[in-house]
Amino acid sequence: MPMSEPIDWLPDGTPYSPRFGDRYHSELGGLDQARHVFLGGCGLPAAWADAPQWRILETGFGFGLNFLVAWEAWKADPRRPRLLHFVSAEAFPVSADAMRQAMPREPGLRLLAEELATRFQGLLPGVHRLAFEQGRVLLTLYIGDAQAMLRRQQITADSIYLDGFTPELNPDLWSADTLRALARHCRRGTQLSTWCVARTVRDGLAQHGFQVRKVDGVPPKRHNLHAVFDPAWQPRGPRAQPQEAITPRRCMVLGAGIAGAAAAASLSRRGWQVTVLDTADAPAAGASALPAGLFCPHVSPDDSLLSRLSRDGARLTLAQLQMLSGQGLLQPGTDWCDTGVLEHGVEAAPRLPRDWQSPGPGDHWSRPASADQLSAAGLPADAPACWHVQAGWVRPARLVQAQLALPGVRWQGRACVARLARTDTAGGAPVWQALDAQGNLLAEAELVVLALGPATNALLEHSLGAQAAWPLQPIRGQVSWDVHTPASAQAMPPFPVNGHGNLVPAMPLPGDAAGPGWVMGSTFERDQTALPPSPEDQAAAHAANGAKLAQLLPRAYQGLQGFFDAPPRATWGAVRVASPDRLPVVGPVSDQAPGLWALTAMGSRGLTLSLLCGELLAARLHDEPLPLDARLAAALASERLGRRR
């Protein structure tokens, strides 16, 4: 797809679409329409008063004016919902530069528009989640044909904005098939508003269950259209049995690694009081105690499921790191850095998707490495390599600590949960109780999230029986790390490199370490669970990491050869788990155990995928718009493991 939708500009500054032969809007008309036809036409902000969440679905994002007006109204409303979801389908996204050129002049809206434009990039076909207001205003963009995207995605809408170029110029957006697809996402009572009063649109809406009426329009139009989804028949399909609204109460998250902290953060933003329990004395004592790791997208010629999933994860991880830094919980440059990552294809050249055009939105994600980047890494000009733009390094323990410091999250260490039991309370509402080996109560809550990694199956078996175990494979990983000498520091590239293991070349070390450190790893020791590893295993892993580095970055290896020739001084080892298809596991544990969910099996991509999976878990729990394509979400669903037994 092209870099962005071409835009012409009329003498009065109005954006004009050469593709459709029509203007987007004038500034005054566009704002009036956004405020009165759409926001007011759907009864907002009054309709969302005191709601836990509100979900707006729009056709035709354009320059985002309807979103900006809804966001502005949400900020100004003391009775606003805890979360505002705005979901918009757009086949031809404009560029961030064009968005800036068309910014409204009102100061308040202009500030919001600049924040939107800053995030408005890398919009390849698919689903993109952009977060604002510390994750409480969530924009989900469906990039692609509106009809196809609406048929494929999962959302229950409270309000619908039916927008776009006129039916004469863009008939597909107003077709009966599109209106049918919209109706599939309605609950009874969903309000719809549009400026279009064409007879075909009125009849199409009525045919698909909407009660339609004309209302006074915004000049120069005499009328607008208002509709309420209230079919005379009982709907079938997804809207027939809407998910029962869940009230945030108490939640126990078992496991204080990256996955557990991600679940705690996502649920606390939705009003849950979360207690995170772990056997260790401090958070991030397991696999998340890694000195530093990478978040980075994966690339493949066919743009595989993993490639698309990892882009969604990298975008959300970077956004969360920025958000936590804005709250003063992380320090950029010390706890994390979006350096970009060079991927050197030692065993096979990294291949970008075949259908990516350059220039194009894919350039915001990954592109061929430049001569300067290869030179900086000490690699030859013809080395097979690509550059990942939205990527960098993180100190996992600091990320975990930051998420556990969010309001509504409480840490409880030295909590050795041996069994979970579901019991009724005096008030009649069942709760889960976490019990130690002696049967003592450690904590109780209405919801439990298992983020235990290799300890998941033991707890499932002790709590639900042997048949509850999942087919998870333990994989031990070991890295080598140390403090730089002046000579080794000079041999390092200025950015991380992956492709055959990965090297974080320079990062601040905690405590009293004298200078920056480096990290190289990791090994993949399947079915190995012994911790700490034996001295012999540590030495073998140290040698393996050195051998990988020698192939990945010969110059960097020469600078660190003294470290690798000597016995390991600083190593780290932990056990991760992977599912049979090497994808994370997100969702309910069993129909027979209501309120028991899991977030696990991040494998070697915990920093890239855990935060996305935390948002997916919360979205599934609360019947929210999903933060990724529904097909990707289905691939991560815990229900798939039951089918493998």
Swiss-Prot record:
Gene3D superfamilies: D-Amino Acid Oxidase, subunit A, domain 2, FAD/NAD(P)-binding domain, Vaccinia Virus protein VP39. Residues 1-230 are annotated as: tRNA (mnm(5)s(2)U34)-methyltransferase. GO terms for biological process: methylation; tRNA wobble base modification. GO terms for molecular function: flavin adenine dinucleotide binding; oxidoreductase activity, acting on the CH-NH group of donors; tRNA (5-methylaminomethyl-2-thiouridylate)(34)-methyltransferase activity. The keyword Methyltransferase applies. One of its GO terms (cellular component) is cytoplasm. Its main location: cytoplasm. It catalyses: 5-aminomethyl-2-thiouridine(34) in tRNA + S-adenosyl-L-methionine = 5-methylaminomethyl-2-thiouridine(34) in tRNA + S-adenosyl-L-homocysteine + H(+). Residues 254-645 are annotated as: FAD-dependent cmnm(5)s(2)U34 oxidoreductase. Keywords: Cytoplasm, FAD, Flavoprotein, Methyltransferase, Multifunctional enzyme, Oxidoreductase, S-adenosyl-L-methionine, Transferase, tRNA processing. Pfam families: DAO, Methyltransf_30. Its cofactor is FAD. It is found in: Cytoplasm. The keyword Plastid does not apply. Catalyzes the last two steps in the biosynthesis of 5-methylaminomethyl-2-thiouridine (mnm(5)s(2)U) at the wobble position (U34) in tRNA. Catalyzes the FAD-dependent demodification of cmnm(5)s(2)U34 to nm(5)s(2)U34, followed by the transfer of a methyl group from S-adenosyl-L-methionine to nm(5)s(2)U34, to form mnm(5)s(2)U34. In the N-terminal section; belongs to the methyltransferase superfamily. tRNA (mnm(5)s(2)U34)-methyltransferase family. This is tRNA 5-methylaminomethyl-2-thiouridine biosynthesis bifunctional protein MnmC. It comes from Delftia acidovorans (strain DSM 14801 / SPH-1). The gene is mnmC.
